[in-house]
Structures are given as C-alpha cells and as structure tokens.
A protein has these predicted regions:
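Conserved catalytic core of the tyrosine transesterase superfamily
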Residues: 1-190
Length: 190
C-alpha cells in the first residue's frame, strides 16, 4: 500500500506574533500600509490568499468582506472586526489618494497590477524574519491562525466554518485541531 506524502504541520502564530508581523511593515510607505491590510485580511478574516488578492474595493465594507471567488466558486460574506476594519480602511483611503481606480484590485502593486501569490508568500517570509518570528509564516498559516484565534475568543465552530468558507464542519475541525501533545497532557493534570 502506498502512503502519500506527509502533510507539513502548520505553525499557528499567536496574536502577538501576527501583530509583530504587521509592525514589521513600513508604517508610512504605501506598500507597508497595503501589506498591513493584506495581513489583517488573511489573519482576521481567514481568507485564502487567492480570495484576498481577487478582492476589489467594492467588496469591503466597515464590518464585512464579500468573497466572490471562493473555493468551489462559492461566494460568501465574512466578518471584519473594528480593529481590522480600521487597518483595511487606511489602505483603501490611501489607494484612492494614490489615484487607483475602483476597478483595480484592492491589493495591487504601485503600478496597479494585481499582487501575485508567490509575491505574497515571499513577502510574509521576509516580514517574519524582520519581526524575529522563527515559525514558518505563509498565507495559509495566517488563515489557520485566524481560525484558532476565533475559537480562543469564544466564537462558535459553525460561525468559524462559515468565515472559512467550509461546506463541511469536519474540514473546520482539522483547522482547529492544533493542540500539541504537551497541551493535552497539561489539560489532563487539572
């Protein structure tokens, strides 16, 4: 019997590590402000990288994001907390000041071209190094981290599943099953 390749365990970032990642972005350069917004959308809204880079400005409101190109072509609306909304709004205002057209993607280069997934992966790796984060940081890891943080904050698994765009709760449970053996042992000691 053939066994497929082992899946690499996803490193879950703490909320503090996610914030460090955002702080590693330039606080003044347009690309830094854009990158902060991209990180917060991947992390707090739990979007897939392609869903995030496919967003247009009209897809984002003060409390939600409308995803049109979800996996399996299923559209959905996800929530956006006030703190994250402020970060995204800052980028939305700046991109308007820079003269970007509403028809251009929300997350684009300074020339108005859509971001590439490979660029985003490289960007997160570079920012993680700058922030002193030793864990493997990548777009899907931010999505997983966001889901775990939502659970830690007391959100219902059904709500988290809808945020993630999963059609099956079992898929969501694999995202949330990130307990380390030491955590399980410690829980049994109380």
């Amino acid at each position: 019997m053939l066994i497929g390749p082992l899946k690499r365990e996803i490193d879950i970032l703490t909320s503090d590590e996610c914030r460090k990642l955002m702080k590693a972005c330039s606080q003044k350069a347009p690309t830094g402000i854009r990158n902060q917004a991209l990180i917060v959308v991947l992390w707090r809204s739990c979007l897939r990288i392609q869903e995030a880079i496919d967003l247009s400005p009209k897809d984002v409101s003060s409390d939600s994001i409308r995803v049109h190109s979800g996996k399996g072509e299923r559209a959905r609306t996800v929530g956006l907390d006030p703190e994250s909304s402020a970060v995204v709004e800052r980028w939305a205002r700046l991109r308007q000041e820079l003269g970007f057209k509403p028809s251009q993607r929300l997350f684009c280069t300074l020339k108005g071209e859509p971001l590439e997934t490979s660029y985003c992966r490289h960007l997160l790796k570079r920012l993680a190094k700058k922030a002193g984060i030793e864990k493997r940081v990548h777009p899907h890891g931010l999505r997983h981290s966001g889901a775990v943080h939502l659970l830690d904050e007391g959100h219902n698994v059904v709500v988290i599943s809808q945020q993630l765009g999963h059609s099956n709760l079992a898929t969501t449970n694999t995202y949330l099953n990130h307990l380390k053996p030491a955590d399980v042992v410690a829980a049994m000691q109380t």
